Curated annotation (Swiss-Prot):
GO cellular component terms, A-Z: cytoplasm
SUPFAM superfamilies named among the record's database cross-references: Anticodon-binding domain of a subclass of class I aminoacyl-tRNA synthetases, Arginyl-tRNA synthetase (ArgRS), N-terminal 'additional' domain, Nucleotidylyl transferase
Subunit comment: Monomer.
Protein name, entry field: Arginine--tRNA ligase
GO MF entries: arginine-tRNA ligase activity; ATP binding
Source species of the chain: Escherichia fergusonii (strain ATCC 35469 / DSM 13698 / CCUG 18766 / IAM 14443 / JCM 21226 / LMG 7866 / NBRC 102419 / NCTC 12128 / CDC 0568-73)
Family that this chain belongs to: Belongs to the class-I aminoacyl-tRNA synthetase family.
Gene responsible for this protein: argS
Length: 577
């Protein structure tokens, strides 16, 4: 149920009847304060100006045409022309009942789209580090949300599995295998890459061999392809362990590395030349874009093929967008890539649009994100100033959560403690990131993220178990409540019910904007409203069975909404804490 959409349509029709243009925007929003009702329509200001009348006068006329019978108990004009809408308790009660009848909690299925989501994208022969965390978990939350809504989602893990460095890596792997240490060396990917680079920089004979190997690999030589595949396989096997620990839905089947687009690159360069978009400039092939200016104010040149014949990331990204539209039949493509890549993507997409590879009707969206910072406000590093491996970060999260859980539950059996520590530790790392607006940098702080108060995973997980405990104490099964009516008489019952019914609106925003922090804020607010409801509206000691069962149903929908909401974020819930 999307109440905002329902009210928007009703207000829009009333505005048109009052003389507003057919494309008017009612601007119906959830009210910020209880005294302004549940929703507020703010669109009178802009429309009244166009009509040459006072906003309040327009609001009064709109009210004469606005029929919210059975939806709102009160509608009033506030200030210069805001329309405040107070939802009818009977309407709330009926919709709570409806939500409890479906596994989807009453969430409608939008028109199905094929949506490609590009996220995570680690590099081959390197271990995943904290720089991969944001793309991986924000992208996965978007994927889970879109899939829940009913879209066909294609996960695209754009792995860095191609480039000149592979000559160096294959030459080093070959050397290690000759010394019978190939598998052992690859167990430490980071060390393997570092040693290969050191030899490449210091040993000219090795460097020459590496350069020859690049040519052989790129020409499709089977021996070199096999060595390359070995590097990719070992890396992705290690990455899969990290994905599974993070409770992220990516698998090996989702890998669509840079190498996938190699066969397309010569054809794309030739096509861009034939279309007059690409020209020769100082031996290289360049596309000049009027939308981007260089320091001299001239159109910026974007190189798509170097004079030695090599291709660039831009060429691959052009091919990638084309493939996602033509082969994967995407209706929409989302890229979870950090904000530093924004101009690069905009240039690639400008070329894609000019060449007609992806029509304007198919959005290409850069859902960019900021950096993860240490407490000093600088990029998050180890004490020695090195890059933090993602596996090490998750180990520390687990260890800290283990101590925290053991402290609170000294008698908990070891296997149960491990399961709980895993849910809390991994959940804390993910939620701390997901609860921040992705477009900003955020400070990584262990103490804050593992706290049992505030907008944190441990607080949300505890809030869920607290609602479940009401049912354990009530000693009643969900099925026994099915026939019981929902009755809303108290303000706090109404506030909780209205917020519960805003779940679909929240999912819709996350799906449209790719902003999981909106879901985190909603769930945190919901947990707070339940707390207040629990305190002021006795459940187990209610005045009669009818009120008790009605309140139990509100508690039940709260538990289901918290669990489902956290699931769309990839945060595990537990039954007890």
């Amino acid at each position: 149920m999307n109440i905002q959409a329902l009210l928007s349509e009703k207000v829009r029709q009333a505005m048109i009847a009052a003389g507003a243009p057919a494309d008017c925007e009612p601007q119906v929003r959830q009210s910020a304060k209880v005294q302004f009702g549940d929703y507020q329509a703010n669109g009178m200001m802009a429309v009244a100006k166009k009509l040459g009348m006072a906003p309040r006068q327009l609001a009064e006329q709109v009210l004469t045409h606005l029929d919210l019978n059975g939806i709102a108990s009160k509608v009033e004009i506030a200030g210069p022309g805001f329309i405040n809408i107070f939802l009818d308790p009977t309407f709330l009660a009926e919709n709570v009942q409806q939500a409890l009848k479906s596994d989807r909690l009453g969430v409608a299925t939008p028109e199905k789209q094929t949506i490609v989501v590009d996220y995570s994208a680690p590099n081959v022969a390197k271990e995943m580090h904290v720089g991969h965390l944001r793309s991986t978990i924000i992208g996965d939350a978007a994927v889970r949300t879109l899939e829940f809504l009913g879209h066909k989602v294609i996960r695209a893990n754009h792995v860095g599995d191609w480039g000149t460095q592979f000559g160096m890596l294959i030459a080093w792997l070959e050397k290690q295998q000759q010394e019978n240490a190939g598998e052992m060396a690859l167990a430490d990917l980071e060390g393997f890459y570092r040693d290969a680079k050191k030899h490449y920089d210091e040993d000219e004979e090795f460097a020459e061999r590496a350069r020859n190997y690049v040519v052989k690999l790129q020409s499709g030589d089977e021996y070199f392809r096999e060595m390359w595949r070995k590097l990719v396989d070992i890396t992705m096997t290690q990455n899969q362990i990290t994905y599974d620990r993070l409770n992220v839905t990516l698998t090996r089947d989702d890998v669509m590395g840079e190498s996938l687009y190699n066969p397309m690159l010569p054809g794309i360069v030739a096509d861009l030349k034939a279309k007059g978009l690409a020209v020769e400039s100082e031996g290289a092939t360049v596309v000049f874009l009027d939308e981007f200016k260089n320091k001299e104010g001239d159109p910026m040149g974007v190189i798509i093929q170097k004079k030695d014949g090599g291709y660039l990331y831009t060429t691959t990204d052009i091919a990638c967008a084309k493939y996602r539209y033509e082969t994967l039949h995407a209706d929409r493509v989302l890229y979870y890539i950090d904000s530093r890549q924004h101009q690069h993507l905009m240039q690639a997409w400008a070329i894609v649009r000019k060449a007609g590879y992806v029509p304007e009707s198919v959005p290409l969206e850069h859902h960019m994100f900021g950096m993860m910072l240490g407490k000093d406000g600088k990029p998050f590093k180890t004490r020695a100033g090195g890059t933090v491996k993602l596996a090490d970060l998750l180990d520390e999260a687990l260890e800290r959560a283990r101590r925290l859980v053991a402290e609170k539950n000294p008698d908990m059996p070891a296997d149960e403690l491990e399961k709980l520590a895993n849910a809390v530790g991994i959940g804390a790392v993910k939620y701390a990131d997901l609860s921040k607006n992705r477009t900003t940098d955020y400070v990584f702080d262990w103490d804050n993220m593992l706290a049992f108060e505030g907008n944190t995973a441990p607080y949300m997980q505890y809030a869920y178990t607290r609602v479940l405990s009401v049912f354990r104490k009530a000693e009643i099964a969900e099925e026994e409540l099915a026939a019981a009516p929902v009755i809303i008489r108290e303000d706090r019952e109404a506030q909780l019910a209205a917020r519960l019914l805003q779940f679909e609106e929240t999912l819709t925003v996350v799906a449209r904007e790719g902003t999981p922090h909106v879901m985190c804020a909603y769930l945190y607010d919901l947990a707070g409203l339940f707390s207040s409801f629990y305190e002021h509206c006795p459940i187990l000691s209610a005045e009669n069975e009818e009120v008790r069962n009605s309140r139990l149903k509100l508690a039940l929908l709260t538990a289901k909404t918290l669990k489902l909401g956290l699931d769309t974020l990839g945060i595990e819930t537990v039954e007890r804490m």
